[in-house]
Amino acid sequence: MSSLVRPINLGKINHSQSTVKDYILLMKPRVISLVIFTGFVGMWLAPYSVHPFIAGIAVVCIALGAGSAGAINMWYDRDIDSLMKRTQKRPIVRGVIESDEALSFGLITGFFAVFFMALCVNLLASFLLLFTIFYYICIYTIWLKRRSIQNIVIGGVSGALPPVIGYAAVSNTISLESIILFLIIFIWTPPHSWALALFCNDDYKNCKVPMMPAVKGTLYTKKQILIYSILLFIVSLMPFFIGMNNFIYLIIAGILGVVFLYYAGSLFYDTSDNKQAKRFFAYSIFYLFFIFLLLYSTNTISTIS
């Protein structure tokens, strides 16, 4: 398939307009906040202890790694970002950061994140961080996003790895516990992203990104959201059954999951505008945050010492 990148004129760059805030926005701070939180929970649940200073370095490296991937993603997607309403205010599109500077910033930030993770934490965590950055940029952004309807499903691997990295930073291992953390985010990502695609469908059609609603239609997408929501409900209860979290987790996670299924079912039967998709999208963010907060607060394994 030919490239969907379109030549665009972003206008004259005014370097005096660039601020620290612009570079923070370049790193996708909302994504970073979730990455930091899930990565920290992964560290907390590891059945070993680590010095808080080392844990802090690991968290910073995870954040910088995510930020570097976000910056390079914005560099590569600058053409379609200029066509989508929700991304038209990104720094490169606004012309406050030059595209080459964004690429350099992302590469340098990623290098130091991986380097210091290896130097100060351990090689496994460093390798997983490097793999996550590579996967998000090369597999998702460059290869899948503009070519496959399964872009979110396959590409979701990178977004689900932060708790695995955090767990490995403390334990220097990959275990069943960290795999379950991975699966929770991995299965959560498609319904969350497809709900967004439902109410941003015109944007994705305009820039020819093959999101599921644009290719398969609304009803098919809603069916997939419901299927993944059922799978998520099942996987979200696994931490209790392997002894990672206590009975309180089972009860509250079960309630949160039932509400998630309610929103998915309501979305499936909804024939009106996109209000229900927006409600589901908003709840999905709350759901993931609260599930990981529960994983943190009801664990039965250990804590960082």
Swiss-Prot record:
Reactions this protein catalyses: heme b + (2E,6E)-farnesyl diphosphate + H2O = Fe(II)-heme o + diphosphate
Known EC number: 2.5.1.141
UniProt pathway: Porphyrin-containing compound metabolism; heme O biosynthesis; heme O from protoheme: step 1/1
Membrane topology value: Multi-pass membrane protein
An example molecular function term from Gene Ontology annotations: protoheme IX farnesyltransferase activity
Any one GO CC term of the record: plasma membrane
Keywords, in A-Z order: Cell inner membrane, Cell membrane, Heme biosynthesis, Membrane, Transferase, Transmembrane, Transmembrane helix
Source superkingdom: Bacteria
Transmembrane segments: 31-51, 52-72, 96-118, 123-145, 151-171, 179-199, 225-245, 247-267, 281-301
UniProt subcellular location: Cell inner membrane
Main location: membrane
One biological process term in Gene Ontology: heme O biosynthetic process
Family membership: Belongs to the UbiA prenyltransferase family. Protoheme IX farnesyltransferase subfamily.
Role summary: Converts heme B (protoheme IX) to heme O by substitution of the vinyl group on carbon 2 of heme B porphyrin ring with a hydroxyethyl farnesyl side group.
Classification via PANTHER family: 4-HYDROXYBENZOATE SOLANESYLTRANSFERASE, PROTOHEME IX FARNESYLTRANSFERASE, MITOCHONDRIAL
The name this protein goes by in its record: Protoheme IX farnesyltransferase
Source organism of the structure: Rickettsia massiliae (strain Mtu5)
